[in-house]
Structure formats: C-alpha cells, structure tokens
C-alpha cells in the first residue's frame, strides 16, 4: 500500500493571541441559546449558535480537559476565515459536565460519567434540538468522545475533525506517572503539560500563561479533576484499519486528523491515522505548531476545515485564496499538488448559512497564506495502486 506526503507551505498571517491579551478578550459575543440538557447520564451544558437548517448537519464541538467550549474554540470560530464557514452552519458547543463557566461543584460522592457515557449523552443533545446529523470537531478528550459517538452512531455523523486524538487507553506507566505527578504537581501544571509541548512552553510563554491563569481562576478544580480522571480511565477505541474481506471496527465517515508538529499528542495522532480507512482519512501536521492549533494557527485550520467541508458536498461558492487565484491565472492546476488526485472536495451541493449574518467578504487573513488541498486519495479511476493514506504537512 503506497503512501504520499504532500508538503504545503502555509504562512500564518498573525498570531491569534497577542501579548497582553486575555482569554476573556478573545471571546466575541454571539446570539446563542444555552441549555442544560438532561440525558441518560446526567445534565450537560450546551450552547447553540444559529438556527439549524433542515437536513443540513450542525457543527458540534467538544473541548479538551482544562478547557470549555469558549476557551477551546471561540478564538477559532471568531476568526474571520472561520466565520465564512459558520455562515453556512449552526454550531452546537457541548461542555463536559461541570466544565462550563460558573459551574457549581458536584456533591460529595458524585459519580462522574465515563468517557463512553459522555459519548452516550450526545444523542439526547441532538434530540433536544431536533438535529439529525453533525460534523464533529473535537480536541483531545473531546476528540475521543466524538470518535466514540461516531462509532456508536455512524448515521448521526457526516464527518469528524479530530485534533490531538488519542485512540488508546491510558497505559499502566502513564497512569502511574499521572498519579505520582498528582501528588507532587499542581493541577494547572498537569493540564498545561497535556495541552502544550515542552518546546511551546518555552517559546509561547504568553499563551501558556494565559491558559494557566484560566485554569486557576475560571475552572472549578474539583469538577476538572473528575473530568481528568474520566479521561485517564478511558478504554481503547479498538479501531482497526479495514482490510478487504474482513470485518473491522473503524470510522465510517470522512475524518481530518490535526496535530501540531511539536504537540505532545503527535505519536497518538499518527497511531490513530494508522487505524482508520485511508480512503476517508487525512492527517494534517502543522509545522511550527504546538498543542492547540486552533489557537496558534487559526488560518491554517480554517482553510483545512473549509476544504474538508467542501469535500462533503457543502460550500460550493466558498471564496478562493489569493494563491488559488494566482494558480488559476497562471494555468497551474490545484492537482499539481498530487498529480492524479481528483478534487472531490470541490464537488459540492447547495446550502445556506446560519451562524452569522455575513455576506461576501475579502479573504484578507489568507491573502498571504497558501491554498491547502486536503482531498484524501481514494483511488481515482484508472489508478490500480489501491487506496492511499494522505498526509499533509503545512
């Protein structure tokens, strides 16, 4: 089975978090519905932005430990290029129990849901809002939860963007190390070491400090500890790469795996990629990026997400980047990135946008960046080499 790596250079226009900025300053207000929804395994806090449109999926997000939907995703969704996408979709943000802003402490003896149970809470969320399907975006623990949800309910998931996903159970040595570090290390330090790589903690001091302060000042420490314990007690997802003539458990929907090249989750994401269907999976490694690409590289992630969504048949009229236009003007085809690869990510159907009321706009934030083609290799007609797993390094 052959594999191809496509190197695409995308320059980030500007850092999302400037010196002196705080998390609060990054959180743009939207007209939203917020509800605490009762499910099979307790209550979950949900924020719905926009109005769902007919049979169109919503974008459903799930955050990592030490975060909630605001600190994990608002910086990305407030970014101009991402708003081009969210004009087309309602967005449903799910906060793990007790992780939302102002969450009350759980009573003594409260049994926090397992990771499997957190995934089992999501059908109740969709039912509450009358939603039929989602495009999921999960980070870390949230990526695991959405993957489990997709395995259990494939008919409800049209696609997944998985940032820093780890499909494996916590190893015994990792479990022991986390227990020992819990005795000697403050909870914020444990979370920071999960979110950021060592290199990033030295080079991105301001961002790391901002998130450390969020953990200290805004998160309920008891509730956070319960969520961390649930994540560290997760089961192996037991997924396998499908082989002809065999029945295997794996994702049925398209998946975009995202990881920064200096993220502590690199090995886990590569492992996950090896277990998924190569005709439906793209691995996106971001150069000069740490553990939170949605924070430090929003332009790259928004660009990747746009073409991923287009590959599912949406956003046919999305604007072209300057590099894409320059290639067209010079007679250079997008497929030059991968000779025979077909552009299935641009054969879209029609749809409308609901998250924000924006019309056409200029692509100022990507005018200096490069076009990213993330169409997975799916064995185009005439190609007898078999399926290829695609990796994109940017």
Swiss-Prot record:
Under stress conditions, phosphorylated in the C-terminal on many serine and threonine residues. Phosphorylated in vitro by PKA. Phosphorylation enhanced by increased intracellular cAMP levels. Homocysteine induces dephosphorylation. Phosphorylation by SGK1 is cell cycle dependent. Keywords: Acetylation, Cell membrane, Charcot-Marie-Tooth disease, Cytoplasm, Cytoskeleton, Membrane, Microtubule, Neurodegeneration, Neuropathy, Nucleus, Phosphoprotein, Repeat. The modification Phosphoserine is found at residues 2, 319, 326, 330, 332-333, 336, 342, 352, 362, 364. It is found in: Cytoplasm, Cytosol; Cytoplasm, Cytoskeleton, Microtubule organizing center, Centrosome; Nucleus; Cell membrane. The modification N-acetylserine is found at residue 2. Gene3D superfamilies: alpha/beta hydrolase (3.40.50.1820). Residues 339-368 are annotated as: 3 X 10 AA tandem repeats of G-T-R-S-R-S-H-T-S-E. InterPro entries: AB_hydrolase_fold, NDRG. Induction: By homocysteine, 2-mercaptoethanol, tunicamycin in endothelial cells. Induced approximately 20-fold during in vitro differentiation of the colon carcinoma cell lines HT-29-D4 and Caco-2. Induced by oxidative stress in colon cancers. Decreased expression in colon adenomas and adenocarcinomas. Induced by nickel compounds in all tested cell lines. The primary signal for its induction is an elevation of free intracellular calcium ion caused by nickel ion exposure. Okadaic acid, a serine/threonine phosphatase inhibitor, induced its expression more rapidly and more efficiently than nickel. Pfam families: Ndr (PF03096). Its main location: cytoplasm. Residues 345-371 have a biased composition (Basic and acidic residues). The keyword Cell membrane applies. GO terms for molecular function: cadherin binding; gamma-tubulin binding; microtubule binding; nickel cation binding; small GTPase binding. One of its GO terms (cellular component) is extracellular exosome. It comes from the Eukaryota. Residues 327-339 have a biased composition (Polar residues). Belongs to the NDRG family. Stress-responsive protein involved in hormone responses, cell growth, and differentiation. Acts as a tumor suppressor in many cell types. Necessary but not sufficient for p53/TP53-mediated caspase activation and apoptosis. Has a role in cell trafficking, notably of the Schwann cell, and is necessary for the maintenance and development of the peripheral nerve myelin sheath. Required for vesicular recycling of CDH1 and TF. May also function in lipid trafficking. Protects cells from spindle disruption damage. Functions in p53/TP53-dependent mitotic spindle checkpoint. This is Protein NDRG1. It comes from Homo sapiens (Human). The lineage of its organism: Eukaryota, Metazoa, Chordata, Craniata, Vertebrata.
């Amino acid at each position: 089975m052959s594999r191809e790596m496509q190197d695409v250079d995308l320059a980030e226009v500007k850092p999302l978090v400037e010196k002196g900025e705080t998390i609060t300053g990054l959180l743009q207000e939207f007209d939203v519905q917020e509800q605490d929804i009762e499910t099979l395994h307790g209550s979950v806090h949900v924020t719905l932005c926009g109005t769902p449109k007919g049979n169109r999926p919503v974008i459903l997000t799930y955050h990592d430990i030490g975060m909630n939907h605001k600190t994990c995703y608002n910086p990305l969704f407030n970014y101009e290029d991402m708003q081009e996408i969210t004009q087309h979709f309602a967005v449903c943000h799910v906060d793990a129990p007790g992780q939302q802003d102002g969450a009350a402490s759980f009573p003594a003896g409260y049994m926090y849901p397992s990771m499997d149970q957190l995934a089992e809470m999501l059908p109740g969320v969709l039912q509450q809002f009358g939603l039929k399907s989602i495009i999921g975006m999960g980070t870390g623990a949230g990526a695991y939860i959405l993957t489990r949800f997709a395995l259990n309910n494939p008919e409800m998931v049209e696609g997944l963007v998985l940032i820093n996903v780890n499909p494996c159970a916590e190893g015994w040595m990792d479990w022991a190390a986390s227990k020992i570090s819990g005795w000697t290390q403050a909870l914020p330090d444990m979370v920071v070491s999960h979110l950021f790589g060592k290199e990033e903690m030295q080079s991105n001091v301001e961002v790391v400090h901002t998130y450390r302060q969020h953990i200290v000042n805004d998160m309920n420490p008891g509730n956070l500890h319960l969520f961390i314990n649930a994540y560290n007690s997760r089961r192996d997802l037991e997924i396998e790469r499908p082989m002809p003539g065999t029945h295997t458990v794996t994702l049925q929907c398209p998946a975009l795996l995202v990881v920064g090249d200096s993220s502590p989750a690199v090995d886990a994401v590569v492992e996950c990629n090896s277990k998924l269907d190569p005709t439906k999976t793209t691995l996106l490694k971001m150069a000069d990026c740490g553990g939170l690409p949605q924070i430090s590289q929003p332009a790259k992630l928004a660009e990747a997400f746009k073409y991923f969504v287009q590959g599912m048949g949406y956003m046919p009229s999305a604007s072209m980047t300057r590099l894409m236009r320059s290639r067209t003007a010079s007679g250079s085809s997008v497929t030059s990135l991968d000779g025979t690869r077909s552009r299935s990510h641009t054969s879209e159907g029609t749809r409308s946008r609901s998250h924000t009321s924006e019309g056409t706009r200029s692509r100022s934030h990507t005018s200096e960046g490069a076009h990213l083609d993330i169409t997975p290799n799916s064995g185009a007609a005439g190609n007898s080499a078999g399926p290829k797993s695609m990796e994109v390094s940017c």
